[in-house]
């Protein structure tokens, strides 16, 4: 999810770039929360990446991301998420909360009341964003 969502911010960085970037492309942790980074439609952002690759004869696109997805994040691409149940105090709970809003508490309460297993080998859930 973080990788897919990071594509938007990489496209924003590349929208007016014609020459190869030598020091590497990275999306920093809090970069998505800067209002100046939400300037393109998602499709335009992906097209900026493709144009950059074409202009520089690149067949492979390499970048890094450090973004944290927390409440207040505006999702650009993802409407559904399959994930396991995360421990309290995990930053991954921030991602779930950002994705489903306050419903995360009801989801986790239900999981705990019904003895769902948590962590990597535990139960998983399919979450949908409320698009209204």
Residue locations for each model-derived region?
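Surface-exposed, charge/polar-rich loops and edge strands
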Residues: 1-132
């Amino acid at each position: 999810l973080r990788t897919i969502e990071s594509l938007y911010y990489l496209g924003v960085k590349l929208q007016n770039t014609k020459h190869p970037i030598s020091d590497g492309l990275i999306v920093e942790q809090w970069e998505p929360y800067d209002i100046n980074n939400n300037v393109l439609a998602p499709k335009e952002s992906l097209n900026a990446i493709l144009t950059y690759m074409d202009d520089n004869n690149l067949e492979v696109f390499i970048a890094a991301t450090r973004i944290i997805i927390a409440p207040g994040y505006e999702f650009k691409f993802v409407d559904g998420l399959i994930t396991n149940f995360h421990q309290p105090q995990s930053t991954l709970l921030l991602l779930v909360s950002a994705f489903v809003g306050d419903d995360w508490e009801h989801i986790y309460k239900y999981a705990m009341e019904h003895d769902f297993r948590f962590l990597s080998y535990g139960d998983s859930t399919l979450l949908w964003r409320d698009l209204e």
